[in-house]
Amino acid sequence: MSGFSLESEFYCCKCGTKGIPIARKKGKAREAGHLKKLYCLKCGKETNHAECKEFTHYSKADFDFEREYGNFDENQNRILDYGLFRDKMHNKGVDLP
């Protein structure tokens, strides 16, 4: 099945709005949580969007958690790797998704 593709959802790291989903060929798929520059219709400019895939280690709930607790800087880049960020929040007693 060389034409098999997987669809990912993307969410703007600045405003949290769902962007346009992208289908990738299985061999070209990125890891869940990957950041990609896409145009955000709400922000009106190109921003980093987090790639979310349900039933993986990085879903929409993980994105919401990371955004709510401030793991993106003013340029929508991650401050800490998501695994390190989860560990830090767990050590602070924050409920994880």
Predicted regions and their residues:
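Short linker/helix segments within small regulatory modules
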Residues: 25-37
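Short, charge-rich amphipathic interface segments used for partner binding and complex assembly
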Residues: 42-45, 51
